[in-house]
Design a protein with these regions (language model features):
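Conserved glycine-rich cofactor-binding loop
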Residues: 8, 13-17
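Active-site beta-alpha loop architecture of Rossmann-like, nucleotide-cofactor-dependent enzymes
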Residues: 17, 39, 97-100
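Aromatic pocket-lining residues of Rossmann-like dinucleotide-binding sites
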Residues: 26
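Conserved glycine-rich Rossmann-like NAD(P)H-binding loop of the short-chain dehydrogenase/reductase
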Residues: 31-47
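The beta1-alpha1 cofactor-binding region of Rossmann-like NAD(H)/NADP(H)-dependent oxidoreductases
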Residues: 43, 63-76, 107
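A glycine-rich helix->loop->beta "capping" turn
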Residues: 56-59, 79-92, 98
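Substrate-binding pocket helix/loop in short-chain dehydrogenase/reductase
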Residues: 101-102, 106
C-alpha cells in the first residue's frame, strides 16, 4: 500500500517546475491531485500534467486560479471539495513576484 492512498492534495502553481514535481511525487504515493495554474500559456502544460498523473492510477484536475487573489483561492478550494470530497494535504507552492527583486517589493 502506498503512503497517501486515497488522500487528496492541493498543490498551487503546479503546471511546471517544482510544483509539477511535487504533484507527481504525491500522486506516486497514491494521492489524488488538484492543482492550480495561473496563465493561459500554462494550460497545455497543466493538461499534460493531469494526463501524466492519471497514468499513476489516481485522479487529477487542473484549475486556473490566481494564488494572489483571495476570492479565487476560496472558489478553488470550494471546487476541489465539491469534486474530490475533501482536502487532506495543501502545498502552497505558487510564486508571486512583482519584479523579481525582493528588496524592491512593497507589502
Amino acid at each position: 500500500m502506498k503512503l497517501l492512498t486515497g488522500k487528496v492534495a492541493i498543490v498551487t502553481g503546479a503546471a511546471r517546475g517544482i510544483g509539477a514535481a511535487i504533484a507527481l511525487k504525491l500522486a506516486a504515493q497514491g494521492s489524488h491531485i488538484a492543482f492550480t495554474y495561473v496563465s493561459d500559456s500554462s494550460e497545455e502544460k497543466a493538461n499534460s500534467l493531469v494526463a501524466e498523473i492519471e497514468k499513476l492510477g489516481v485522479k487529477a484536475k487542473a484549475y486556473k486560479a490566481n494564488a494572489a487573489d483571495f476570492a479565487a483561492c476560496e472558489n478553488f478550494v470550494n471546487d476541489v471539495v465539491a469534486h474530490f470530497g475533501t482536502v487532506d494535504i495543501c502545498v502552497n507552492n505558487a510564486g508571486i513576484s512583482k519584479d523579481n527583486l525582493l528588496l524592491r517589493m512593497t507589502p
